[in-house]
Amino acid sequence: MTLEIEFLNHLPVLINDMREKIGRSRYPLLKMVAEQTTGLILYMQLDDKIKYSKEAEYVKSFLLELVNLLKDIGIPQKILVRDEESYSWLLEFCQLLPCSLEISEKLPVIDMTTNNFFSDL
């Protein structure tokens, strides 16, 4: 099983609900896990980085969610991420599993899902 994971990139959609509280709109973060062979989205959530005082807290919360998901679906053979930053956050985690971790500029299932979602907005 190969998983595509996205958790550090902002979506190109403004959230205006906090404009009055913080004086500006912001872009949500997408947390998504997809299984590459079947094309299934196994986990998807929009999150707001403003809830976390440090990026490490945000990543820790995502890793806990990922652990819970892997308890249900099993350990993948490979995890694909889009960038060096995601890779560095997940490297030690993947070594503990163990599973391979690779950077891939394209995450086909996640890309198709986000493109389809945002083409309708």
PLM segments and residue spans:
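Secondary-structure boundary/capping micro-motif
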Residues: M1-L121
